[in-house]
Structures are given as C-alpha cells and as structure tokens.
C-alpha cells in the first residue's frame, strides 16, 4: 500500500482513515510502517481485551506524539486492516500515556458507506455504554505491560476533533 499517496481529507467534511486494527479482534496491536506500507505486529497485548471500535489513523497527518492522528471508527462490523474508510469526525477522546498526549478522534462512516450513522452528529448522539466501553478499554489495555500507562482526561467535541485534524495536517 502506498500510504503517502492517500490524502487526509476525502473532501471538506470527510476524512480518510486507514484501518490497522478491526473492532473485536484478538489482543494484538498492529501498526502500519508508513515507509514500506507493510502491516507489522507491534505487540501482543497482555490483557485479554479487544478494541471496541475499528482503530486506525488519518494519513498525511502528524500528531504531537510523532505518529499520524489516531482514529476510532464506530461501526457495526470489523473492517479489514489496510482498508481506507471515509468518515466524519464527531469528537475526540482526550488521553495521555507514558509518551505524552495521545488523543483519539472518534468518527463514524459517511452516509455513502452506512446511512445508519446519519443521525450521529456529535459524541452525545452515541450510546452511553459504547462511550463507557471506549474509556474502559483505554484505561486498562496496558495494565499488564511494565512501564506503560494511560490516563483518560475526558472528551472533546467535534470542533476540538476538527482542530486536532487540521493541526495534524498542517504539522505534516
């Protein structure tokens, strides 16, 4: 995959997200090598937890941690790693870990991909239990890894998410 050829924005209101980890998959952390385009096993997670949403990144961006901007894509189905999915940002999970700030954009598929998310415009439109699962996952998925930790500091709205995306595009 030629990751560098994929733009961050599909259009003004849509972002491209490259999926690295499907929702509900085994406790394996995958990461794309941005130079080669190969999908590597980053590590086997020591907790027996699975990602509550599809997890990936926005290409052609750079976040404060030196990696592309991270995204959780809320969907009804797992998405195959390497797939590019057009999404709308609806908010952001604010968190930090042993390496510093590590925000996660929360997004939903565009109307063309799945009309069942058309009513989701912001975080408050998501099921409260899903938000609790997301927080629980990130608060605990590194619990058994020595020297690693996560602190969830709250949620940011759609405007905050769009600001982080724009900063990520500008930084790259």
Swiss-Prot record:
<keyword id="KW-0963">Cytoplasm</keyword>
<feature type="binding site">
    <location>
        <position position="43"/>
    </location>
    <ligand>
        <name>substrate</name>
    </ligand>
</feature>
<feature type="binding site">
    <location>
        <position position="70"/>
    </location>
    <ligand>
        <name>Mg(2+) 2</name>
    </ligand>
</feature>
<keyword id="KW-0460">Magnesium</keyword>
<dbReference type="InterPro" id="IPR036649">
    <property type="entry name" value="Pyrophosphatase_sf"/>
</dbReference>
<dbReference type="InterPro" id="IPR008162">
    <property type="entry name" value="Pyrophosphatase"/>
</dbReference>
<comment type="subunit">
    <text>Homohexamer.</text>
</comment>
<comment type="function">
    <text>Catalyzes the hydrolysis of inorganic pyrophosphate (PPi) forming two phosphate ions.</text>
</comment>
<feature type="binding site">
    <location>
        <position position="29"/>
    </location>
    <ligand>
        <name>substrate</name>
    </ligand>
</feature>
<feature type="binding site">
    <location>
        <position position="65"/>
    </location>
    <ligand>
        <name>Mg(2+) 1</name>
    </ligand>
</feature>
<feature type="binding site">
    <location>
        <position position="70"/>
    </location>
    <ligand>
        <name>Mg(2+) 1</name>
    </ligand>
</feature>
<keyword id="KW-0479">Metal-binding</keyword>
<feature type="binding site">
    <location>
        <position position="141"/>
    </location>
    <ligand>
        <name>substrate</name>
    </ligand>
</feature>
<dbReference type="GO" id="GO:0000287">
    <property type="term" value="F:magnesium ion binding"/>
</dbReference>
<keyword id="KW-0378">Hydrolase</keyword>
<dbReference type="Pfam" id="PF00719">
    <property type="entry name" value="Pyrophosphatase"/>
</dbReference>
<dbReference type="GO" id="GO:0004427">
    <property type="term" value="F:inorganic diphosphate phosphatase activity"/>
</dbReference>
<dbReference type="GO" id="GO:0005737">
    <property type="term" value="C:cytoplasm"/>
</dbReference>
<protein>
    <recommendedName>
        <fullName>Inorganic pyrophosphatase</fullName>
        <ecNumber>3.6.1.1</ecNumber>
    </recommendedName>
</protein>
<feature type="binding site">
    <location>
        <position position="55"/>
    </location>
    <ligand>
        <name>substrate</name>
    </ligand>
</feature>
<feature type="binding site">
    <location>
        <position position="102"/>
    </location>
    <ligand>
        <name>Mg(2+) 1</name>
    </ligand>
</feature>
<dbReference type="GO" id="GO:0006796">
    <property type="term" value="P:phosphate-containing compound metabolic process"/>
</dbReference>
<comment type="similarity">
    <text>Belongs to the PPase family.</text>
</comment>
């Amino acid at each position: 995959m030629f990751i560098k050829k994929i733009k961050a924005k599909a259009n003004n209101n849509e972002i491209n997200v490259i999926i690295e980890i499907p929702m509900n998959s085994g406790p394996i952390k995958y990461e794309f090598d941005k130079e080669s385009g190969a999908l590597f096993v980053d590590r086997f997670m020591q907790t027996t937890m699975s990602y509550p949403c599809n997890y990936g990144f926005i290409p052609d961006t750079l976040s404060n941690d030196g990696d592309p901007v991270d995204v959780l894509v809320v969907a009804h189905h797992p998405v195959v790693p390497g797939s590019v999915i057009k999404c709308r940002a609806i908010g952001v999970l604010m968190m930090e870990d042993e390496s510093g700030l590590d925000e996660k954009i929360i997004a939903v598929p565009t109307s063309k991909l799945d009309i069942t998310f058309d009513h989701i415009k912001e975080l408050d439109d998501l099921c409260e239990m899903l938000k609790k699962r997301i927080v629980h996952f990130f608060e605990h998925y590194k619990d058994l890894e020595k020297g690693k930790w996560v602190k969830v500091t709250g949620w940011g709205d759609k405007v905050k998410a769009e600001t982080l995306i724009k900063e990520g595009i500008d930084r790259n």
